[in-house]
Amino acid sequence: MHKRSLGGLALATVVTIAAGAPLAAQRLRAVEAGVGGALTVARHTMAGVEVGAGYRPGGQSRIALALDAGSEDGQAAARAQLTAQFLVTPNARRGTGVYGGIGVAVAGRRRSPGRGYLALLLGLEAAPGRRGGWYAELGLAGGARLAAGWRGRWFQP
């Protein structure tokens, strides 16, 4: 009886380890780059272009940096946002993926001091498990922010 228990335990251990290997292989790591437009509506409205970069270490997380440059009340303005994001379906190769994020943002314009904010966002993106596609974000960071564009992804083994 004792040998059977040990044999069953060994078999269960092997099955558990073997089942975990495909799961680890499905964890997509990626480097991302994007370009688009951004609009921030607050006391002053800023409209401009956005460039972004992101890193997905695997699982459901992404670290993203977005840099916006444009115009606010006729003055040159810039904005930077760094967020930690949670992707609901990071491996989806079809359909739309949903993600949310929290982080920090800093915004400034010519002849005016910069301002720092807590940043919250909710986003949609085309098939996050594919090499690229559109994205759209709605966020709060010193006002309402809308951004949309195209994001490319380079997956790593």
Per-range role (PLM):
Residues 36, 48, 101-105, 123, ...:
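Glycine-centered flexibility sites
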Residues 52-115, 119-128:
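Gram-negative (and chloroplast) outer-membrane scaffold detector with strong preference
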Residues 7, 12-17, 41, 45, ...:
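A generic structural micro-environment signature
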Residues 60-63, 115-157:
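Predominantly the C-terminal beta-signal and adjacent terminal strand-loop region
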Residues 1-28, 157:
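Cleavable N-terminal export/targeting peptides
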Residues 21-79, 86, 151-157:
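Short glycine/proline- and aromatic-enriched beta-strand/turn motifs that initiate or cap beta-hairpins
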Residues 41, 90-92, 108-110, 142, ...:
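Residues that cap or initiate secondary-structure elements
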